[in-house]
UniProtKB/Swiss-Prot annotation:
Recognizes and binds the 7-methylguanosine-containing mRNA cap during an early step in the initiation of protein synthesis and facilitates ribosome binding by inducing the unwinding of the mRNAs secondary structure. The gene is EIF4E1B. This is Eukaryotic translation initiation factor 4E type 1B. Residues 1-42 are annotated as: Disordered. eIF4F is a multi-subunit complex, the composition of which varies with external and internal environmental conditions. It is composed of at least EIF4A, EIF4E and EIF4G. The keyword Protein biosynthesis applies. Residues 16-25 have a biased composition (Acidic residues). InterPro entries: TIF_eIF4e-like (IPR023398), TIF_eIF_4E (IPR001040), TIF_eIF_4E_CS (IPR019770). Residues 62-65, 98-102, 157-164 are annotated as: EIF4EBP1/2/3 binding. Residues 32-41 have a biased composition (Polar residues).
Length: 242
C-alpha cells in the first residue's frame, strides 16, 4: 500500500561532478584526515553508494551521527492531514542516504501540494510533536521560476547540512527540514527545537544561509511554530533574521 501511496516520490537523479582537488584540503582535520561528515566527503561517497565497488570488495559503511527518517506528504483534502503523511524509510549511514536520494524523485518534479521532510528518528514532521512545539523554523521562500533552477540544489544542500551535523554543537537543536512544493512558490525550512534559544537559533541560521550560498543582501527569517500555528504564513512575524 505504501509503495503505491509514495510512487510519486520515485525517480532518477542527475550526476554531480567532483570538486577541484584543492577544495578537498579545506575539509581535512588538523591531523590531516578528512572529516567523515564534511560536505565533500558526503558527496564523494555518493558514487560508492551507487556502484558498491567491485563485487569481491565489501563496501565500508560510514555511519551518521543520527538516524534520519524521510517522510512524504501528498495533499488529499478528502483525508485527514496525518493520513496524507507517509514514512518512506530511515537511514543511518552515508551510503544509505545516497542510495535513498538516488531512487526518489527530485523535489522539483513533485506535484503541487507535496512535501518531503527529513527528520531525526523519533520526531514527526508536525508542530504537534513534543520535540517541535516549542521550536520554530528558518524559512527560505522561492519564486516560482526558481523551481527548475535552484530548488533541487538548495534542498540537497539542506539535507547535507542535516546529516553532516554542519551546525557544530548547535546541531542538537535541529529537528529536521521540510520542502513544500506549492503553486505560488516553493519553500524550504529547517526546524529547530527551542525558539527561545537565541544563540543556537542564530548560529544555525547564519551557517545555513552561508551553506546555501545566498547573497548577503538576501534576508531569511525565523518563525516560532507557536506563531505560525495561529496565523497564516504571510502574517507570522519573524522572531530572528539573518
Amino acid at each position: 500500500m505504501l509503495a503505491v501511496e509514495v510512487s510519486e516520490a520515485e525517480g532518477g537523479i542527475r550526476e554531480w561532478e567532483e570538486e577541484e582537488k584543492e577544495e578537498e584540503a579545506a575539509e581535512r582535520t588538523p591531523t590531516g584526515e578528512k572529516s567523515p561528515n564534511s560536505p565533500r566527503t558526503l558527496l564523494s561517497l555518493r558514487g560508492k553508494a551507487r556502484t558498491g565497488g567491485p563485487m569481491e570488495v565489501k563496501l565500508e559503511l560510514h555511519p551518521l551521527q543520527n538516524r534520519w527518517a524521510l517522510w512524504f506528504f501528498k495533499n488529499d483534502r478528502s483525508r485527514a492531514w496525518q493520513d496524507n503523511l507517509h514514512l518512506v524509510t530511515k537511514v543511518d549511514t552515508v551510503e544509505d542516504f545516497w542510495a535513498l536520494y538516488s531512487h526518489i524523485q527530485l523535489a522539483s518534479k513533485l506535484s503541487s501540494g507535496c512535501d518531503y521532510a527529513l527528520f531525526k528518528d523519533g520526531i514527526q514532521p508536525m508542530w504537534e510533536d513534543s520535540r517541535n512545539k516549542r521550536g520554530g523554523r528558518w524559512l527560505v521562500s522561492l519564486a516560482k521560476q526558481q523551481r527548475h533552477i535552484e530548488l533541487d540544489r538548495l534542498w540537497l544542500e539542506t539535507l547535507l547540512c542535516l546529516i553532516g551535523e554542519s551546525f557544530e554543537e548547535h546541531s542538537r537543536e535541529v529537528c529536521g527540514a521540510v520542502v513544500n512544493i506549492r503553486t505560488k512558490g516553493d519553500k524550504i525550512a529547517v526546524w529547530t527545537r527551542e525558539a527561545e534559544n537565541q544563540a543556537g537559533v542564530l548560529h544555525v541560521g547564519r551557517v545555513y544561509k552561508e551553506r546555501l550560498g545566498l547573497s548577503p543582501k538576501t534576508i531569511i527569517g525565523y518563525q516560532a511554530h507557536a506563531d505560525t500555528a495561529t496565523k497564516s504564513n504571510s502574517l507570522a512575524k519573524n522572531k530572528f533574521v539573518v
